[in-house]
């Protein structure tokens, strides 16, 4: 393609905004007029040659066929495109008929827009073009804008023509028009940095992604292929992918059909994308409007290639109702089959949804659900998706994010991740990564993941574009691709100051990213003693303790008088508000309800009764104390529920490392059950205390102890290691009483570039720092 011609077109169109719109729109709004007008003019030029044929078809259907509604298909056939216009107008005839009367032009313009087929009318509506035209007519610039777009000095038609001076203007192909339109979008996005990152990925990042996706299959690219972007924005990923294939890997001796698919939620960017498809001759019906997460528009389709830069750090809370019912995932795209530590797979599937504040990994799972199975020698599917750092490590073992990473790695889909330089994007300076997925890895990559750190590979821009202050040069992309394609490990290089430079690459086994998360328990040791001070807080309900304590201190026993608290309700709620105690209506009602206070006092009365029976002696053996309480309850007429009994016991007991262990229960195991337990834990009977089973001296009899929640800890054990061996090496030497809670084990997965690529930079010697200070003082 001759980009010099295209760049001249871009410059001319860009100048229209400054010439005609400067005093009518603020600079950031120029795009609202220029982009839809470019689309309109291109469609207009495409339809001009078939105008009479379309009007004749309209006449035929209305007069000969007596059609009440026009039939789309013959009109499309008459126009030669998937769109048409049944009005008598073109932009040139609109201009010719208008003279200087803006109102006549506005009226005719609306008639012209209403004559388009529904697919173009949808674009007009999404662009809000009628409103812009009305505004320009009011400001007396509509005629000027139309005149600029039909100027003989630019050629937006698919035929060669001459300008006003007789110079030849080359034809503008669909591919060339796509380039012009994309370049305009890029320039507007760079001008409007506030919104740029929402739907615009820097050109060189897309170029790297297309190389990563298509280069490994350059000799296997099918003649018919599908490309999908679930967050397509203005369509840059899709059209750049198409351009890349057509320019770099054209089909030899055959034609190649590339079908582009996408979905976009923003009206304007959807209109831009759909326009771009129409301009380039792609099927605009393949671009859908709406939320990718809420509705699975392409549920029955599978795609060859997928590229995307989904929004990161953006909440999906408003879409949860379409994905989950309570805690249950109802959308199959976001469920995965994973085995637990014992090898059991939940038939319902495991949750693969991230925290509601960041939905980026949902877009990745949407693409994974659209991968083609590599059967009968087919290529399968390849995905390139841009994400921020939280996608690599956020989320605990067993959580949605971790499950997603684990699923991709266990199923050997993750081929590589490339870390990009900071400040490469227009609206964020954070670190970003390209995830490369492949469900048909070549043999030498199977079971492996390549991590490439290209964060130090960039050249500085002379002028910042929003947050963007650097870019990839062609040689940087070539270096990344060479490292990736050759599947090489590359050591990090340091400059003379010890700072990292260049590129680094490491290759890992899939298991290197997995870990077991296991809970380590320690026994609860408690002392207990009844006292008036300890049971006094039982007067107050835990959920309202602070407010109730204030009321009791202020009014004493009057709080139990019927209606008293209600009379003083305003002063009580005012105090709560002043002291930042938030009360909803239900809590307020409880707080001022005498019956609620009386009910709470019954627990205190029960504790006082037990104190009289058990006494106020201190117990260093909680087991003995509990037996005494149970005996007292049995001997008395007190009827306490389990929560009420526990509330009293917890109020008068506390952890003390010198006290006896609190027994949970005594377990009796038959020989068969004991053998099953030993097989389950892969240990000897003598090792059972390390799993919480302590022998009692009788064959098959073990005691288990209550664990202390305050002393409970968790350990992350690499997937390649034995949990028990890790416990023996790293935990037991320091905490002799600890045991493993094997029922708690969850499998997690995380990827840490910092851990793998960090190079320690030694501190400078004091002498060197001192000398530098002396030198600076001399200069001053």
Provide a role label for each language-model segment.
Residues 1-217, 286-297, 419-422, 446-453, ...:
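Non-catalytic, mostly N-terminal accessory regions of nucleic-acid modification and defense proteins
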Residues 29-42, 287, 343-437:
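Conserved Class I SAM-dependent methyltransferase catalytic core
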Residues 189, 253, 283-287, 340-346, ...:
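Short acidic (Asp/Glu) and glycine-rich catalytic loops that position anionic groups and cofactors
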Residues 239, 271, 308-310, 361-365, ...:
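Feature representing long, continuous alpha-helical segments
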Residues 246, 278, 282, 311, ...:
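Hydrophobic alpha-helix feature that most strongly marks membrane-spanning transmembrane helices
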Residues 312-315, 319-357:
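Conserved catalytic motifs of ABC-family nucleotide-binding domains
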Residues 426-534:
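Flexible, glycine-/basic-rich loop-and-beta segments that form/coincide
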């Amino acid at each position: 393609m001759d980009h010099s011609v295209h760049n001249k077109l871009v410059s001319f169109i860009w100048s229209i905004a400054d010439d005609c719109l400067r005093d009518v729109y603020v600079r950031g709004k120029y795009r609202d007029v220029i982009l839809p007008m470019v689309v309109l003019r291109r469609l207009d030029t495409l339809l001009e040659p078939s105008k009479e044929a379309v009007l004749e078809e309209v006449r035929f259907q209305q007069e000969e066929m007596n059609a009440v509604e026009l039939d789309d298909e013959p009109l499309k056939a008459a126009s030669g495109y998937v769109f048409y216009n049944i009005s008598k107008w073109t932009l040139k005839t609109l201009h010719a008929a208008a003279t200087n009367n803006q109102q006549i032009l506005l009226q005719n313009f609306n008639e012209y827009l209403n004559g388009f087929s529904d697919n173009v009318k949808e674009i007009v509506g999404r662009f809000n073009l009628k409103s812009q035209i009305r505004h320009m007519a009011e400001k007396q610039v509509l005629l000027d804008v139309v005149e600029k777009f039909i100027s003989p000095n630019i050629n937006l038609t698919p035929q060669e023509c001459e300008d006003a001076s007789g110079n030849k203007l080359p034809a503008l192909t669909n591919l060339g028009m796509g380039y012009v339109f994309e370049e305009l979008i890029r320039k507007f996005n760079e001008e409007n940095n506030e919104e740029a990152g929402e739907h615009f990925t820097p050109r060189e990042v897309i170029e790297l992604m297309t190389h990563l996706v298509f280069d490994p299959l350059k000799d296997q690219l099918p003649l018919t292929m599908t490309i999908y972007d679930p967050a397509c924005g203005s369509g840059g990923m899709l059209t750049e992918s198409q351009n890349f294939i057509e320019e770099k890997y054209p089909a030899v001796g055959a034609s190649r059909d590339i079908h582009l698919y996408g979905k976009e939620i923003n009206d304007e960017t959807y209109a831009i994308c759909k326009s771009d498809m129409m301009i380039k001759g792609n099927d605009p019906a393949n671009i859908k409007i709406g939320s990718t997460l809420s509705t699975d528009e392409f549920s029955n389709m599978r795609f060859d290639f997928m590229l995307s830069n989904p929004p990161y750090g953006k909440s999906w809370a408003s879409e949860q109702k379409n994905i989950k019912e309570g805690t249950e995932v109802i959308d199959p795209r976001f469920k995965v089959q994973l085995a637990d530590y014992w090898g059991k797979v939940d038939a319902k599937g495991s949750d693969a949804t991230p925290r509601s504040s960041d939905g980026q990994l949902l877009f990745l799972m949407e693409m994974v659900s659209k991968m083609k199975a590599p059967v009968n020698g087919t290529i399968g599917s390849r995905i390139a998706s841009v994400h921020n750092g939280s996608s690599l490590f956020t989320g605990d073992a067993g959580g949605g994010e971790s499950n997603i990473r684990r699923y991709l790695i266990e199923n050997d889909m993750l081929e590589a991740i490339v870390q990009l330089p900071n400040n490469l994007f227009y609206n964020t300076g954070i670190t970003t990564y390209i995830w490369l997925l492949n469900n048909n890895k070549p043999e030498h990559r199977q079971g492996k993941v390549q991590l490439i750190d290209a964060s130090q590979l960039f050249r500085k821009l002379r002028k910042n574009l929003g947050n963007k202050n650097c870019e990839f040069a062609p040689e940087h992309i070539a270096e990344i691709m060479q490292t990736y394609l050759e599947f090489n490990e590359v050591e990090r290089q340091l400059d003379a100051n010890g700072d990292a430079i260049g590129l680094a690459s490491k290759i890992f086994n899939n298991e290197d990213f997995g870990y077991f998360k296991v809970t380590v328990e320690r026994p609860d040791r408690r002392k207990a003693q009844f006292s008036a001070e300890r049971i006094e807080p039982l007067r107050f309900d835990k959920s309202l303790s602070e407010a109730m304590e204030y009321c009791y201190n202020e009014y004493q026993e009057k709080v139990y008088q019927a209606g008293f608290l209600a009379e003083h309700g305003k002063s009580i709620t005012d105090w709560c508000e002043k002291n930042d105690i938030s009360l909803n209506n239900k809590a307020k009602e409880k707080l001022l309800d005498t019956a609620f206070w009386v009910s709470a006092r019954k627990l205190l009365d029960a504790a006082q009764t037990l104190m009289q029976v058990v006494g106020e002696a201190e117990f260093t053996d909680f087991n003995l104390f509990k037996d005494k309480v149970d005996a007292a309850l049995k001997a008395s007429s007190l009827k306490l529920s389990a929560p009420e009994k526990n509330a009293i016991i917890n109020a008068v007991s506390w952890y003390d490392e010198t006290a006896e262990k609190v027994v949970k229960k005594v377990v009796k195991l038959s020989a068969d059950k004991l053998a099953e337990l030993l097989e389950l834990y892969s240990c000897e009977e003598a090792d059972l205390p390390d799993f919480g089973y302590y022998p009692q001296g009788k064959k098959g009899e073990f005691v288990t102890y209550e664990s202390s929640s305050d002393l409970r800890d968790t350990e992350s054990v690499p997937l390649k290691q034995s949990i028990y061996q890790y416990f023996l090496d790293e935990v037991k030497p320091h905490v002799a009483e600890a045991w493993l809670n094997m029922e708690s084990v969850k499998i997690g997965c995380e990827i840490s570039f910092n851990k793998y690529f960090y190079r320690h930079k030694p501190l400078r010697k004091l002498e060197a720092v001192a000398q530098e200070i002396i030198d600076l003082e001399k200069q001053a």
